[in-house]
Amino acid sequence: MTTPSSPTPTPTPTPLTPNALHRRVSAVGRLTRSLFDQVGAGSRFVVATLRAMRDTQDWLPEFSIHARVLGVESLPIGMFIALFTGIVLALLASYSVGDLVPPYFVGTLVQKTITLELAPVLTGLALAGRVGANIAAELGTMRVTEQIDALETLTFDPMSHLVVPRVLASTLMFPVVVGVAMLVGLLSGWGASLALLDITTPQFLKGVRIFFTDFDVRYGLVKSASFGAAVALIGCRAGLNTQGGAQGVGRSATRAVVISAVMILVLDAFWALVWLTGRTIR
């Protein structure tokens, strides 16, 4: 005859000891303090950059060079991304609405999504990798090879010579790249609608025009300008703070790309809250 087994006792959670609780609170405190330190250091860096903009004779000769490197040479990336984004958007719009709405609404959805969100954000994320890493690696190499120290010894201000032209070029050229990406995205969406969805050109253009406002373009371009400024500032600060030789340069480039991507998403949410809250489509 088998005896019934006794129920398994439920384990009671081990209470935190004072030392363990102190360690956890200390870790949270260190993380919070580090976050505020980084925000404060970043704010001081932005203020120093704005002050250095007064020395136009220092940064103006370098501006066109960086505008070409950071902006013009980034156009193929923006166009390539927008090309396939427009095609995918047209197909998704047709799949989502089906026969529920007139066919011209495909043009409306493509136009609104490209200009308001996808062209600025996707292009910004791609350029964060190219521009942010480029700036951080270039300035980081100059730091570890003591070129920046040599400039300071010769009484040249690194902020006006190195930081300001890159920040201004990135801020002004990001909207140019995004504007071209908007146009390419609309054209590719139109081409996909004609070739794959049996939507005529008048129908697609009707959908583009019916809810189009100049706010759509202004919103996307202003947002992209803020992305460009953030990417350049983060890349410059990461590069100037580089330590540890070649490995330090690699860490600075990686840090610049990651922080820039996060900041782009934060700014995207910020501009949506500021400009889109309570705003209707018309």
Give the ranges of each region predicted by the language model.
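Hydrophobic alpha-helical transmembrane segments that constitute the membrane-spanning cores
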Residues: I81-V88, T123-A128, V164-S193, S226, ...
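Membrane-interface helix starts
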Residues: R54-F80, V258-A261
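Start (N-cap) of specific transmembrane helices in multi-pass transporter permeases
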Residues: E146, D157-V178, S252, A256
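Membrane-interfacial helix-loop-helix connectors in multipass membrane proteins
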Residues: L92-L116, M182-A225, L233-R255, W275-R282
